């Protein structure tokens, strides 16, 4: 019986990190593409498109990366669970500052789900694009990603979707992190998330505003 080939090496720290997820991929090729995506996302290219990532990762076939993202048999949920589990272990119970922010990517056309003409915060203007609400942790001057949720405009809802405001998505992110057992004492967010009426969902998980409605002290303990 022939021995399975080893995955093509990339950057040492990328290889070491991705090895923690290797068992989640059914074959070596899928695992390699997982590593190549990390190399591309960490590179200095301005637009992290699949063709650009394929080029910077070693002149790969962009279609192969597209197949990995769209059709390869791996689970986003399993990957997210593994990542959050590893992060929780690394934190070892330490509290951090939780930052809620939104970001957007400009898109041409409306082929991609939930793309609409809407306000893109990081561009500071209305544009055609997709927006997400993101949760980051800050500890010892290190910023690390936690979770995100795509904002779904009313005009682009799919069958079975329920419209949720950005503050409502923020509440869901906080509650999910609490469910995971992450510990955080302060939530930083844009004033939008503390001043709008639809942010009443913060009530069960916040105690009092600290400043201008953009800082809130919460219980991040399970």
Spans of features found by a protein language model:
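Active-site-proximal, Lys/Arg-enriched surface segment
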Residues: 69-143, 148, 152-154
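Short, glycine/acidic-rich beta->alpha junctions
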Residues: 45, 79, 127, 191-195, ...
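An internal, acidic/charged active-site-proximal segment
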Residues: 155-222
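Gly/serine-rich nucleotide phosphate-binding loop at the start of the catalytic core
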Residues: 3-71
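Short, contiguous clusters of charged residues that form electrostatic/catalytic patches at enzyme active sites
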Residues: 36, 130-133, 168-175
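Short, charged/polar micro-motifs that form catalytic or ligand-binding hotspots
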Residues: 24, 39-43, 55, 121-122, ...
């Amino acid at each position: 019986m022939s021995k399975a080939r080893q995955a093509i090496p990339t950057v040492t720290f990328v290889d070491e990190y991705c090895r923690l997820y290797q068992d989640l991929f059914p074959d070596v090729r899928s695992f390699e593409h997982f590593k190549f995506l990390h190399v591309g996302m960490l590179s200095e290219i301005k637009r992290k498109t699949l063709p650009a990532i394929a080029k910077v990762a070693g002149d790969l076939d962009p279609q192969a990366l597209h197949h990995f993202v769209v059709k390869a048999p791996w689970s986003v949920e399993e990957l997210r669970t593994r990542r959050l589990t590893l992060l929780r272990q690394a934190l070892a119970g330490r509290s951090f500052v939780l930052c809620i922010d939104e970001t957007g990517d400009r898109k041409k056309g409306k082929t991609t789900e939930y793309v609409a003409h809407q306000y893109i915060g990081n561009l500071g203007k209305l544009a055609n694009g997709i927006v997400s609400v993101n949760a980051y942790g800050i500890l010892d001057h290190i910023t690390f990603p936690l979770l995100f949720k795509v904002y779904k405009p009313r005009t682009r809802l799919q069958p079975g979707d329920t419209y949720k405001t950005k503050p409502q998505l923020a509440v869901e992110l906080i509650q999910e992190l609490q469910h995971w057992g992450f510990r955080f004492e302060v939530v930083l967010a844009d004033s939008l998330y503390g001043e709008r009426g639809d942010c009443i969902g913060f009530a069960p998980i916040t105690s009092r505003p600290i400043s201008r409605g953009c800082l809130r002290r919460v219980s991040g303990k399970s």
